[in-house]
Amino acid sequence: TPGDTLNINSGGAAVTSNIGPSSDEGSFDVAGSRTVSYDHIETLGVSGPGAGSLTVSGTNGDDDITVVGTGVDDFTVSVNDSPAIQYTNFTSLTINAMSGDDDIDVDVNMLAIATFDVNGDLPTTSGGDLLSVSGTNANFSPSATDAGSILVDAQTIAIASTEQVFFDGETGNGTLTVTTPAGATTTSLTPGATIDSGDIQVASLLGLTFGNLGATGSVVLDDADAVADDTLVYIGSG
């Protein structure tokens, strides 16, 4: 059976979602209102008419956070074994994964909100936090060892305090573009086990692993400035 349902209308105010100790427990903080706590609720939905901002906080353990686009400004978010909470008419989403080696999975679909920030925070091990994004076309722009941005289809995601990024092209035969920063930069490309997978490392900045581009998918390296001063190193398997 579908169980109990809780629906909240934020009235456009900022919303913070906090996971509880059990999968069906947690709370919502709506700016200007009292905290709404829930327990043993199986279906949850929050609407923020056209101007809502949402912050989702993980735990200090190793979390699995999943975001699935269900519309241009609609999406679901689940944390670990929690229900996938439906958020409708939100224009801003911030994921604060907190401490631990967290996995943040984003299936963009038609999502195109104005602001989407992923903050991995402090890792537990050297492997650290992993952001995986699925779509057809992407443009990845690293800016620091743990930061950058990735545009997947119509959605830009700002990345901070994150150690690994993976792009899944869903065999859509799209184009993956990696934009290198201005100035002379060395980029390494290591092919993967399949023709549509591999690893790209721009200098010592945040690296990118990609897969499932499709048999006719392509990879483009694009220098941010007009001066032809970059170097590409192709690392073969032989």
Name what the model sees in each region.
Residues 1-238:
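Acidic, glycine-rich low-complexity segments
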